[in-house]
Amino acid sequence: MNYRIYSVALALSLLTACGDKPTPLPQPTPTPTPTPAPTPTPEPTPPAYKDYEGYTLIFNQGLASVLTSQPDGVGVASSLSLLDREAKTLLPVFSNKATPLNKEYDGQGYLCEGTLSEAGDYLVYMAKYDFTDDSEHASRLLLFDRRTMRLTKNLRITQPDGDEWVRHSFTFDDGTTYLSFDKKHFYRLNPETGKMTALTGIFGYPTGAASWQDKGYFFVRYESAAFVFDKGSTAARKVPIALSGAQIKEIFRMGAQVILRDTANRYYLFDLATGKVLAVFTLSEPIGRSVTIDPATHRIYYSGGTPNLNGAEAKERSVYTATIDTSRPTSEVQGLTSQLLYTIAGRTEADNRQGFKMQVGYHPDLKALMVSYLDQGRSGPLLHDLTKLLLLQLPTTPSESVKELRTFDLHYASDVSLLSVIRPRPTK
């Protein structure tokens, strides 16, 4: 009996103890940490431009007519237009007719072929042919103020000791111009007096010329080196470039840098300011008529062709691209695989000239490629030359393709040989 009472009492005490234990408070649910929204990549700030900086130069060198074995007149006159910074509007600078910027000048309508380049505050047009006087062979130098696009110097040039046209040239920022004529004659031209001084230390048939800041270069046939002139000098010094056993045979001008091709179909990325080779490479598809470069990435874009014929059919109408690695030693020849980027529609019997004379240029502000080509058939309603200019948006990922942004028709343009964006003057 006592045991039974004790058991009941023990059970009641345990129940009381358990009932007195406090009920645990509910724990607060942790607040999830919000995932921060991704910060959008800021749009690149356009450079602070002034005057015509940021505009694109579109230079049509024109074409001489040939009656027998030598040029005897202007077939298509040279011209220069500007494309505005948004790549929407064309502005003519000079042509065979009066323009808002340059109405009349000596030689107008009688000039064709040659080169256009930048030199300090000048735009330099060296016209190979000046047909204002049929009694002698002459060329002409036109210097434009690149801040206003107005013509400031206009000099007719004849060879002092012969009867040849200017073949290649380069100009320094003071307007001093170095000239090569067809048959191994080289001179320095003073634009203020018109006086020409013979150059020394250079010989051979010229194949190209270029300059940047205070250095100018001539390239001659059968040479593995470049002939260099410092600003103001009349004596050349040689800078070796090509690898042993090869000679430089072709030059592609791209502003501060050029690409040189040697007789073994190797290419050299050459810096004009330093006089140094930055890279040596080969391409699975050779460069045809023109090439341009993105200086930030050293990616090149070029028209296709063949090593010897400088263009053939579909390849001549195509744009290829490849990236040069400038961190590798120049003693190593890089074997680059070219990628097909864009091809103009196939020609037919009616438009068999479509795609000829392709020129390419890179627009660093729009990250776009400019491509021009002759857009005229053998027969049709047009009685003059027509060149098509395309603005192509470059892909940003491997899965994207080139997008055509807009097109322009360049009437009376037979041979566009320069598409280049005017950059602010470099500071030393």
What is each of the regions a protein language model found here?
Residues L63-V66, Q70-G75, Y129-D134, K184-H185, ...:
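Short glycine/acidic-enriched loop and turn motifs that connect beta-strands
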Residues I58-N60, V66-T68, V124-M126, L179-S180, ...:
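Residue position within the beta-strands of beta-propeller blades
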Residues T41-T99:
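An edge-strand/N-cap motif at the start of beta-rich repeat modules
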Residues A48, K103-L116, D161-T171, G201-K215, ...:
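Repeated scaffold domains used in trafficking and secretory/extracellular systems
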Residues T89-Y105, R150-P160, K195-G201, A235-A242, ...:
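A short beta-strand motif characteristic of beta-propeller blades
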Residues E53-Y55, G62, A119-D121, D174-T176, ...:
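Short coil/turn segments that connect the beta-strands within blades of beta-propeller domains
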Residues L14-A17:
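C-terminal motif of bacterial Sec signal peptides marking the signal peptidase cleavage site
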Residues R85-K88, D145-M149, N190-G194, D230-T234, ...:
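Short loop/turn segments that connect beta-strands within beta-propeller blades
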